[in-house]
């Protein structure tokens, strides 16, 4: 079976990196995170990840090599002569060589884009050496080179990699509710919220901030959905919020649902999160039960609710909110079939993200973007500039 290396460099985009690994592993294709310089790597948002192995100058064991984006990570890969030589060798042997966002800079340095159609983040296209023909497309395949455009297109890019290896991307898309989030047929629905429309029509003031938050706590139990957790933190930090992750298990290094290891910022306790303005619980099939069994976690959600603080839950994280009682009588959504689990709520099956009172909920693994954007709206933050920078509308995100 084909084997994939995802090069993980200091300053990489954590959301891109983990989403790519997540989706490839869901397709049951062996995939390793390969640290460019060390086993432990901190990304652009200072989230620490522990890789499966460290690059030793050779990529011979792999059938596909993938370079995620992030300005710092892309620079490190571009300037690593040993990696450039290994990429050249892999490409010459007909192996798949893939890069997204700013990382095609490394392919340019390796001379792999000459005479090729390719894409990358629009802001770096003029910096790429030995470039072929840049095209304004989400994902481009030319021969054995696959390139992708930007952060919000990490899902589409990952599925293109799965398809190239003969994997079953359709099943993964269905299970991760990809089509609930991304209208790949084209056309981006208007973004209506309970707080108003973004951006506001000319002459109309933006909706007032119904909640105030500067600090957001994100719970990180063992078995959590890594791409959900990290992507939510990424987006909230881009909105200017201070965002810390809290390990709820016995160790600050958290073992996640798809076999990755991520370091939480802090250990959880009710006192540790008491001065935070908002709290979020992501999903993960095995992650919810220990949280529900924890009196400290349940008490924390009730305390946030009683204080009128903003609370968020995604995917199976919504069952944690249900167990704590904070969904009672509120409109909420969750993963497919969760209407039978979120029984105290007014379940909304046809909306990917819902905000009611002080609770924001969303549906599943591909929904961190609409969840985070809805969370921003609940805080009176206009998400459109962030959507623009991340090419969310290019991904036809709802």
Predicted regions and their residues:
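Glycine/proline-rich loop-helix segments at beta-alpha junctions forming the active-site rim
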Residues: 335
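Anionic-ligand binding patches
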Residues: 118
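Active-site-adjacent substrate-recognition loops and nearby beta-strands
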Residues: 121
């Amino acid at each position: 079976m084909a084997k994939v290396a995802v090069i993980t460099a200091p300053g990489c985009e954590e959301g891109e990196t983990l989403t790519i690994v997540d989706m490839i592993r869901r397709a049951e294709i062996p995939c390793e995170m390969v640290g460019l310089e060390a086993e432990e790597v901190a990304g652009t948002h200072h989230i620490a990840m522990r890789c499966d192995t460290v690059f030793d100058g050779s990529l011979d064991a792999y059938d596909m090599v993938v370079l995620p984006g992030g300005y710092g990570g892309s620079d490190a890969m571009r300037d690593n002569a040993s990696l450039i030589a290994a990429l050249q060798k892999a490409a010459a042997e007909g192996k798949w060589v893939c890069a997204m966002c700013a990382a095609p800079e490394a392919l340019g340095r390796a001379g792999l884009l000459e005479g090729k159609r390719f894409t990358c983040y629009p802001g770096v296209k003029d910096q790429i050496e030995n470039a072929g023909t840049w095209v304004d497309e989400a994902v481009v395949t030319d021969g054995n080179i696959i390139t992708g455009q930007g952060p919000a297109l990490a899902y589409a890019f990952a599925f293109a990699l799965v398809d190239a290896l003969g994997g079953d991307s359709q099943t993964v898309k269905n299970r991760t509710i990809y089509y609930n989030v991304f209208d790949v047929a084209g056309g981006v629905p208007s973004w209506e919220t309970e707080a108003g429309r973004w951006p506001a029509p000319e002459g109309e003031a933006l909706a007032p901030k119904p909640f105030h938050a500067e600090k957001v706590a994100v719970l990180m139990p063992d078995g959590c959905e890594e791409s959900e957790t990290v992507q939510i933190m990424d987006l909230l930090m881009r909105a200017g919020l201070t965002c810390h992750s809290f390990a709820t298990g016995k160790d600050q290094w958290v073992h996640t649902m798809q076999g990755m290891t991520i370091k939480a910022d802090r250990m959880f306790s009710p006192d540790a999160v008491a001065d935070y303005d908002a709290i979020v619980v992501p999903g993960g099939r095995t992650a919810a039960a220990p949280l529900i069994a924890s009196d400290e976690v349940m008490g924390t959600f009730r305390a946030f609710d009683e204080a009128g603080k903003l609370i968020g839950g995604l995917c199976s994280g919504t069952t944690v909110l249900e167990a704590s009682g904070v969904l009672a009588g509120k409109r909420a959504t969750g993963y497919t079939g969760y209407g039978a689990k979120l029984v105290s709520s007014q379940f909304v099956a046809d909306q990917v993200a819902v905000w009611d009172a002080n609770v924001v909920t969303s549906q599943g693994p591909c929904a961190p973007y609409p969840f985070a954007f809805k969370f921003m709206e609940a805080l009176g933050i206009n998400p459109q500039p962030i959507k623009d920078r991340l090419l969310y509308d290019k991904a036809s995100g709802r």
